[in-house]
Amino acid sequence: MNTNSKELLTETPFKIMLKLSVPAIIGMMVIGLYPLMDGIFAGQLLGQDAMTAIGVSMPFTYFNTGIATLIGVGSSSILSRAIGENNKDTFKKIMNNLLFWVLILSLIITILGVIFSKKLLSLIGAEGTILDLANRYLTIIFTGSLFVNFAQSANMLLRGEGLMKKAMVIMTLGAGLNIILDPLLMIAMRNIDRGIEGAAIATILAQIVQAFVTYYYFKYKSNTIKIEKIKKEITISKEVFAVGVSAMLMQVLTIIQQSILYSQAFRYGGDEAGSIMAATLRIMAFSFIPLWGMSQGLQPAIGTNFGAKEYIRVKHIFKIFLLSSILLAAIFWIPAMLFTENLLSLFGLSNTTLINGTLYFRIFYSVFLGYGIMIMTLTFFQAIGDAKSAGNLVIMRQIVIFVPAMIILPMFLGLNAIWVTPPIIDIFIIVISIFLYIKTIKKFK
């Protein structure tokens, strides 16, 4: 057990929260720069069509995100508990298993993605020049799936080991390289009408570098985990999939959720509602990243102490993270609710749209203050290996309740239902999350 892991069992919960969460939050914010910078540079250097093409491609990049999250979160949860138990056998097997599944699943994503990328883009309405540009961009992204998925999933394993700063530095390296390469390759390749390919290649090259740096660390530097061979470990694999599936579902089901939000907004409110929804979801996504980063800090803290059967510390750590997540959410929620019109105006909305958008945004964003509760409880269940509770929460929120409610209620209540329904659903899920957490900790002995 390394020094970082021992500290998870001895440091005060507040110090653990600061040590693990700050680097994780910064690291997650860095990850958020990839799609953001691609879009900004494409719009400035290649034009509106290129920016739109990258935008419509983004939902399908969640296939890779889902795979990386499935393997990374599942493996990270197992590792954290193994550290608490000092299970050296798991230390030897965890990376071999991760490499096996990254290789197999990335190969599947690459083949299917390249074959069906154009059809997928057509399904969401891309056509003409935008369809052509988006297909050229997305095909390259799918081709680099192996490097993307290894870089991201192995980084989660670093966090599971409690090495948040190291994980952050490696992610920052990848993001920084992407930001540098993006404009350079777009400018260099736009003269041969391949600027959009330059954007995709920049992203993949950055991930390749991050993947090789990560590989080097685990191969030669890590004191806990070593890369020995590519091998499926049946026992570990079952638990990786059981635990990781709920985290993967959050990524993949977001595609379904956002597709319904957009389609219903356009159907009942036209282009104006669609524009408001686009601005609102961008703000929500940006606000969500720090909470997700904090949850990455919670996972090894809970997992390690749970594995060591330090149940009182598990409760104290969760309490500190929960309260901190509410405070973190408030940092975004308060200014967003006070300066809504100024915030929405950054997205170029017209004055008329801003009048309606201000009210709709405040309704939609109203429950964000409680998002930390929802995310921390979900991460808690993942960390202790309770895949059933974690999976049920995700499926209940994003499919079972959300889909029928968003389809049926607007039929009777019109456009207003599209903005009111999601926060009501979130309140319900937050209450259920708290109930399941209390029920679970009562079983700790």
Q: How should each PLM-predicted stretch be described?
A:
Residues K19-D38, I140, G174, A206-Q210, ...:
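Transmembrane helical elements of multi-pass membrane transporters/channels
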Residues M1-S21, L79-G144, N191-V245, I302-V367, ...:
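Short alpha-helical transmembrane segments in multi-pass integral membrane proteins
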Residues F63-G66, N178-P183, A211-Y215, A285-I289, ...:
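Hydrophobic transmembrane alpha-helices of multi-pass small-molecule transporters
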Residues L8-L45, P59-G74, I78, L103-T110, ...:
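N-terminal transmembrane alpha-helices
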Residues L33-M51, L121-G128, L184-R194, I255-F286, ...:
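Helix-terminus/linker motif at the lipid-water interface of multi-pass membrane proteins
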Residues G72, I141-R159, A167-A175, A199-T214, ...:
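Short runs within selected transmembrane alpha-helices of multi-pass transporters and secretion channels
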